[in-house]
């Protein structure tokens, strides 16, 4: 029987540290529930001591999500560990993940502590965490740049103190695969008691080697990999979950290892994380990128038509990318719409289905055929959203080479109709100024990205917008329409609804 590799997902903690990413509690819960469907072993829900928002996010996941271990990060001090437990105490399977750096550069310049002091601090932290839960993980920050023999001493000490998982990070993404594999092998051979715990790795992607280093570690005895969906994370990101999992699966004859991941949920999870974080997946991204299973070369196309295995080592359906001959359009009924959503893996409540179907019909009037990508965009816009305080009723824009761009907008604000007009430096600017006049709200633009969902002149425009509020929180909004300006307006209205939702949530806490 093959050995198990545990998948520790840190999308909600390390992934959310990506510049410009900020998830509200509702969004964190959506991702957490999808991670349960994906069947990860551990969800690291956040860093409870870092901020009240992080604490509430971890607490919400701990309370609501079942069937998975929920971890909270804590520095190796009493205040952090106590706060982590306060957030995690209602979890079905709580894990406290405590850490301290072990490399000399961190000890000298950041911690200003001796090696012995760090070792004692690590042991005390594990003992304190162990007083709360039997599941305790210890991480030696910047482990790869640490003295190997000192690191082995620290790990042996925390294992003796009760740690059940020891994590060996390549915190700055400095390692090469052969080096990191040998490093893990050395630790496995020179750390007393290590055979009684799970050895974990956490690799960063600064040199583009996070996945390769993770697989090298697994090859040499690691049995937990810490990773994020789409590889998101601070700086250049983390090891991509989908690449680690499919690497182990596709080359199972080499590794002889399994994970518990439900691979058919990979693509859906990737799309959800991309939508909620506002971080698009690069087209040539392995496993989940738009081009991952496309073949343009004539020779490649000929080979794939004759036998897919000539140029495809993974079947797209294996990761949840489906193919269909069913085409939806303006004459399609609710039954066909629901059937296709079911085939794509979306399970909607009746109210959600009704909202999505209304939006589908609106878009089908302006687009001859609605593709699977269009359907996913519709669901991103209409289903995965907060309650609507603001709703777009209509938008009229006047623009041209000799005309001052002017927008007239009609909004429903808590059901009351409001109309405003504004001029701007361009049609989008005029539209946003009209929205700001109507709502009395104005935010700072961080980024504006427009993408065609599919090809063709009737393709849906997908606008992803990021705005910063007065408290420097960054919000992501998305709008979809065959009209670029309408999509832009919908994205801004979406952001305003998120901000209002967060404000009301904070008032009631």
Swiss-Prot record:
GO BP annotations of the record are:
L-leucine biosynthetic process
Q: Does the keyword Manganese apply?
A: yes
GO CC list: cytoplasm
The record ties this protein, via Gene3D superfamilies, to: 1.10.238.260, 3.30.160.270, Aldolase class I (3.20.20.70)
**Tree of life domain:** Bacteria
Q: Per its UniProt record, what SMART domains does this chain match? A: LeuA_dimer
Name the pathway it acts in.
Amino-acid biosynthesis; L-leucine biosynthesis; L-leucine from 3-methyl-2-oxobutanoate: step 1/4
Enzyme Commission no: 2.3.3.13
Segments carrying the region annotation (Regulatory domain) are 391-509
The molecular function terms of the Gene Ontology recorded here are:
2-isopropylmalate synthase activity; acetyl-CoA C-acetyltransferase activity; manganese ion binding
| Record keywords | Amino-acid biosynthesis, Branched-chain amino acid biosynthesis, Cytoplasm, Leucine biosynthesis, Manganese, Metal-binding, Transferase
Catalysed reactions listed for this entry: 3-methyl-2-oxobutanoate + acetyl-CoA + H2O = (2S)-2-isopropylmalate + CoA + H(+)
Q: Which residues bind Mn(2+)?
A: 14, 202, 204, 238
The cofactors named for this UniProt entry are: Mn(2+)
Location of this chain's protein in the cell: Cytoplasm
Q: Which family does it belong to?
A: Belongs to the alpha-IPM synthase/homocitrate synthase family. LeuA type 1 subfamily.
Summary of subunit composition and partner proteins: Homodimer.
Q: Which NCBIfam families match?
A: leuA_bact, PRK00915.1-2, PRK00915.1-3
This chain belongs to the protein called 2-isopropylmalate synthase
Native species: Desulforudis audaxviator (strain MP104C)
